[in-house]
Amino acid sequence: MAAEICIHNATVLNGFSTMKNCAVLIKKHKIIDVFNEDRFVKKTFKPDTTFIDAKGAYIAPGFIDTHIHGFGGFGTDDYKEESILKMSELLTEYGVTGFIPTLYSAPKENMINGINAIVSAMGKEKGAKILGIHLEGPFISPDRLGVQSPDSISPVDIDLMEQLWNASQGHIINMTVAPELKNMRELALYCISKGIVLQAGHTNATYSQMVEGMQARIFHVTHLFNAMSRMHHRDPGAVGAVFIHPELSCAVIADGIHINEDIVKFLVTCKSLDKIVLVTDALKPTKQRK
């Protein structure tokens, strides 16, 4: 890598504004300066600096995907370290710099094998960084399975949760649950003690059950609108709870297929942007090369 790289004639998204005709100076894989075209023209660079004309293209912080099962023909359901590492490598081609590999509900042995594979891959990445583990189950509603298998879900089971946690060596950071399940408060207390963020998803919860979930510190919602109780004027359900309570954050699969694009526009008029997380929920065949 050159001593310094300067990407100029770029549109920079810095999280606060859109900066046009800007340059970004990189040294040893780190951004050391961002400046406008006027400073770029006047600045004196080192003789071995490499210049790249972005031709107006965007430069933005890397994407972080908090809900992803697979990519490019590799997936968490392979239960293999090499599949997780391949996901890491391929995701960088699409601007992803960090991701949370997500496991569906599965028989205990498979879930533990999947957890072991992710833990084993951590620290060996050559691409996007593995930020932790997201368990999408097994404590979810049989009435809102989506594509998950009814044979793989489970009532709340603290002993099972402890086995999954121990296998993760402390790396489970998110878990999708159905707040209405019996003994959910007990599970929530356990997860709070471990620093696990609980998310309401694959849930048939009534509005009052969602409120009870919030009292148990379930403040995030998995793929809003998908696999959850709908909003109704007599019972707002899981969807309605997100719109009624500003403290609830939500993830959305904004691909125009899982939800209509105008629903996304509606959502951003109702929720603060810092309460909306874009996720892919991508599966193994996504961008698979033939």
Question: What positions do the PLM features span?
Answer:
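Active-site metal-binding loops of divalent metal-dependent hydrolases
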Residues: 68, 179-180, 203, 255-256, ...
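Short acidic/polar active-site loop segments enriched in Thr and Asp
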Residues: 97-98, 173, 219, 274
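Histidine/acidic-residue-rich, glycine-tolerant segments that coordinate divalent metal ions
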Residues: 109-236, 287
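Divalent metal-coordination and catalytic microenvironments
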Residues: 10, 24, 29, 56, ...
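Residue-level marker for buried hydrophobic side chains located in beta-strands
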Residues: 6, 62-64, 199, 278-279
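Active-site-adjacent C-terminal substructures of enzyme catalytic domains
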Residues: 209-290
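Histidine-rich, glycine-flanked metal-binding segment
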Residues: 2-6, 12-60
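Metal-associated gating/positioning segment near the N- to mid-region
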Residues: 57-110
